[in-house]
UniProtKB/Swiss-Prot annotation:
Zn(2+) binds at C73, C76, C97, C100. The gene is hypA. InterPro entries: Hydgase_Ni_incorp_HypA/HybF_CS, HypA/HybF. Keywords: Metal-binding, Nickel, Zinc. Gene3D superfamilies: 3.30.2320.80. One of its GO terms (molecular function) is nickel cation binding. GO terms for biological process: protein maturation; protein modification process. It comes from Methanosphaera stadtmanae (strain ATCC 43021 / DSM 3091 / JCM 11832 / MCB-3). This is Hydrogenase maturation factor HypA. Ni(2+) binds at H2. It comes from the Archaea. Involved in the maturation of [NiFe] hydrogenases. Required for nickel insertion into the metal center of the hydrogenase. Belongs to the HypA/HybF family. PROSITE patterns: HYPA. Pfam families: HypA (PF01155).
Amino acid sequence: MHELSMANSMVEAILDTAKKNNAIKITEAILEVGELTMLNPEQLRFMMDILREDTIFEDAEIIINMIPIEVECEDCGFHGISKTDEGMDHLMAVATCPECDNTHVHILKGQECNIKTIKIEREDENA
């Protein structure tokens, strides 16, 4: 269950960034999670909810945008959204070209796990 370690890293990074910017409250965090990370967004959100209890991040809205797998095929030159072999073990997704079914593809998107945006409130904004 790598959702726990990823959730912990994200919560720590969000709280550290908020602290460095003198935040008194975090109101929103937007995350980008690639399909090839094999992270379950519901489990990730659940873990983050537990880890952010009793912090300035506790009541913030968390938005998780899933990023589809984008590939470029070495054989036919296709460039676009891929499909994964759903018959494979869930621990190892295989991206294939939707045009020629080849697995010789360059993965362009779908592996990321980013904190895209953090919205905060500062004390001076409430004065």
